[in-house]
Curated annotation (Swiss-Prot):
It comes from the Bacteria. Keywords: Iron, Metal-binding. One of its GO terms (biological process) is iron-sulfur cluster assembly. This is Iron-sulfur cluster assembly protein CyaY. SMART domains: Frataxin_Cyay. Belongs to the frataxin family. The gene is cyaY. It holds the Pfam family Frataxin_Cyay. One of its GO terms (molecular function) is ferric iron binding.
Length: 109
């Protein structure tokens, strides 16, 4: 994958997370805050815990840091998969956001 292809896929991922946060806030009282700064997106929960998602352009990876740990995702042509087998990005984000918020939250591409 070229740098340009990576950035295209990675930007789509960040935009999808931002849109999911907007949808969650419109349909629930989760009060999720998303803050974007370049290639980094920080999700802040009412209990002040955070999930940080950032782009690692040289490695063609998207990294996610949550209370449960750190994860590295690579695009396999269809989805972003964890490099150590933890699963697909949006499923993992939903799992960690649910734990950190104390309520069921779903994210989608």
């Amino acid at each position: 994958m070229t740098d340009l292809e990576f950035m295209d896929h990675a930007e789509k991922l960040l935009l999808a997370v931002e849109r999911s946060c907007d949808r969650i806030n419109e349909t629930t009282d989760a009060d999720l805050d998303s803050q974007r700064s370049g290639g980094m997106l920080t999700l802040v929960f009412p209990n002040r815990s955070q999930i940080v998602i950032n782009l690692q352009k040289p490695l063609h990876e998207v990294w996610m840091a949550a209370r449960s740990g750190g994860y590295h995702y690579r695009f396999d042509g269809h989805a972003w998969q964890d490099s150590k087998g933890a699963g697909e990005f949006f499923a993992c984000l939903g799992r960690d956001a649910t734990v950190q918020s104390g309520r069921p939250l779903q994210f989608a591409a």
